[in-house]
């Protein structure tokens, strides 16, 4: 098939939000790189906004706009204009406060959408998006790319047998203007792989905080335990997994290691989702990750007192917690 025919056959993908480097990286993978697992997708249009008032995001928009234009992306003036030009959407806006209204427009249009992290700036809006997704029968998913770290995926697939526990050391800088809940801005990169490794079913959470780090201890409904050490002044991704069955003297499994793959594992999952309509992670699981983060924040504010997932959801909505599962 010649290049012109390939362009005609490609799924047209659009970006909402050019305030994150993800937008540029995803465009490069789809439009420039020759990754066979992403073949059949092309980024064709972008709506730049995006945060309106988070400086660390807004100051990127002019530069990233020019970069995606050089890769063949048309810049449009509204979300509605974007939706009219594409088959699928990557909602990349770095500001989770904007996601509720932006996602609803895509849901209404019936277009499949990947909502990049964070799904929302707090659990309240995450629950609203979850409800809207159900109401519209929307095809969507949201995740941190660290869910697709090879070892995390191997653990989730059962390659190491039943997982007894895991402990992760992760960076968790804050959004300096205070627009997001404590962990939704960046700390999600720790919570997401921990749930990937351990599976769903977090029951209760304790969190202890000082000026530079938080230690989150979580207990699953079956009694297993996982831990996060979230650092605000130490930029490292590390951790280990403890399988239930391990030979005596054998070291724990290291979760993260250097990889040249970058965002490709995530974009491959997005491509598969756009082609099949089957999300690699369910909205229910994403919601549990958000409730996990909210419970940790509530616990930290109470000096480490345990908080249940059900309590975190109840504090963010008038609906009963079980309505969301």
Question: Where are the regions that the model predicts?
Answer:
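C-terminal substrate-binding/catalytic lobe of Rossmann-fold NAD(P)-dependent oxidoreductases
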Residues: 213-266
């Amino acid at each position: 098939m010649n290049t012109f025919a390939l362009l005609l056959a490609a799924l047209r993908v659009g970006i909402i939000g050019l305030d994150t480097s993800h937008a540029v990286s995803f465009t490069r993978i789809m439009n420039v790189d020759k990754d066979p697992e992403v073949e059949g997708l092309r980024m064709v249009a972008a709506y730049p906004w995006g945060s309106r008032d988070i400086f660390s995001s807004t100051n990127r928009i002019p530069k990233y706009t020019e970069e995606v234009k050089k890769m063949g992306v048309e810049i449009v003036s509204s979300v509605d204009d974007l939706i009219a030009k594409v088959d699928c959407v990557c909602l990349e806006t770095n500001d989770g406060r904007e996601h509720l209204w932006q996602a609803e427009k895509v849901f209404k249009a019936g277009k499949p959408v990947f909502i990049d992290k964070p799904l929302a700036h707090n659990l309240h809006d995450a629950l609203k998006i979850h409800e809207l997704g159900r109401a519209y029968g929307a095809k969507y998913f949201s995740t941190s790319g660290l869910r697709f770290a090879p070892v995390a995926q191997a653990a989730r697939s059962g390659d190491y047998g039943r997982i007894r526990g895991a402990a992760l050391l992760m960076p968790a800088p804050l959004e300096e203007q205070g627009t997001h809940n404590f962990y939704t801005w960046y700390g999600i990169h720790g919570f997401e792989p921990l749930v990937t490794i351990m599976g769903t079913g977090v029951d209760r959470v304790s969190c202890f905080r000082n000026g530079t780090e938080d230690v989150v201890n979580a207990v699953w409904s079956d009694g297993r335990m996982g831990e996060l050490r979230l650092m605000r002044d130490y930029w490292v991704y590390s951790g280990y997994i403890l399988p239930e069955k391990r030979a005596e003297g054998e070291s724990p499994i290291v979760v993260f290691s250097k990889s040249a793959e970058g965002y490709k594992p995530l974009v491959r999952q997005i491509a598969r989702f756009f082609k099949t309509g089957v999300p690699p992670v369910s909205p229910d699981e994403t919601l549990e990750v958000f409730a996990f983060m909210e419970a940790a924040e509530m616990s930290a504010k109470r000096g480490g007192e345990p908080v249940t997932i059900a309590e975190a959801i109840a504090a963010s909505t008038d609906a009963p917690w079980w309505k969301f599962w």
